Amino acid sequence: MATKAVCVLKGDGPVQGIIHFEQKANGPVVVKGRITGLVEGKHGFHVHEFGDNTQGCTSAGPHFNPLSKKHGGPQDEERHVGDLGNVTAGADGVANVSIEDSLISLSGANSIIGRTMVVHEKPDDLGKGGNEESTKTGNAGSRLACGVIGIAQ
C-alpha cells in the first residue's frame, strides 16, 4: 500500500505548485504543499477522475466521484470523494496547503493515485450556490493548474 504520494501542479499561466500526500494505516490523508502564482483569495481544490493531462487540465474529467454523489464541501456527508474545498492565496499569490481528509485514500476504492489534482480560478461554493453547476463543480471556474498524483518514496 502506498503511504506517500506527490503531485506537481502546472498550467498555461503562472500558477504552479507541489502537493504532498501522506496516509498512515487506515487514517486520514494529510495533504500539504504550496501553490504560487494565484490571485489573492479562495480557489477550488479538487481531485479529478482521470490522470489524463494530454489536453491540459480539461482532459482530467469531472471531480472524482465513485459514490455518485452531488458536489459538496469537505465536511459534508453529500460530496464527491475528490471535493477538498478551497485553498486560500495571500496577497503574495501563495497558498500554503494543509488539509486532512478521511474520504480520499492512497489505496483501495477511493484511491487518488493516478488521478489529477486541480486548482481552480474561483472559490468553490461547496455545493451551496443554488444552481445546477454548483452541485457538479461548486462554480469553481476554469482549471488554472493540474498534475497527476503519483506514488512517492
Curated annotation (Swiss-Prot):
PROSITE patterns xref list: SOD_CU_ZN_1, SOD_CU_ZN_2
Cofactor(s), names only, from the UniProt record: Cu cation; Zn(2+)
Gene Ontology BP terms: action potential initiation; anterograde axonal transport; apoptotic process; auditory receptor cell stereocilium organization; determination of adult lifespan; ectopic germ cell programmed cell death; embryo implantation; gene expression
Annotated positions of the N6-succinyllysine modification: 4, 10, 122, 136
EC number in record: 1.15.1.1
Modification N-acetylalanine, positions: 2
The keyword Phosphoprotein is annotated on this UniProt entry: yes
Residue positions, PTM Phosphoserine: 98, 102, 105, 107
Subcellular location: Cytoplasm; Nucleus
Binding residues for Cu cation: 46, 48, 63, 120
A single cellular component GO annotation: cytoplasm
UniProt GO MF annotations: copper ion binding; protein homodimerization activity; protein phosphatase 2B binding; protein-folding chaperone binding; small GTPase binding; superoxide dismutase activity; zinc ion binding
Binding-site list for Zn(2+): 63, 71, 80, 83
Cofactor, free-text remark: Binds 1 copper ion per subunit.
PTM: Palmitoylation helps nuclear targeting and decreases catalytic activity. Succinylation, adjacent to copper catalytic site, probably inhibits activity. Desuccinylation by SIRT5 enhances activity.
Recorded catalytic activity of this chain's protein: 2 superoxide + 2 H(+) = H2O2 + O2
Lipidated residue numbers (S-palmitoyl cysteine): 7
Sites bearing N6-acetyllysine, chain numbering: 122, 136
One Pfam family matching this protein: Sod_Cu
Enzyme class: oxidoreductase
Subunit structure comment from the entry: Homodimer; non-disulfide-linked. Heterodimer with SOD1. The heterodimer CCS:SOD1 interacts with SLC31A1; this heterotrimer is Cu(1+)-mediated and its maintenance is regulated through SOD1 activation.
Protein purpose: Destroys radicals which are normally produced within the cells and which are toxic to biological systems.
Cited PANTHER family: SUPEROXIDE DISMUTASE CU-ZN -RELATED (PTHR10003)
Family the UniProt entry places it in: Belongs to the Cu-Zn superoxide dismutase family.
Protein name as it appears in the record: Superoxide dismutase [Cu-Zn]
Organism: Cavia porcellus (Guinea pig)
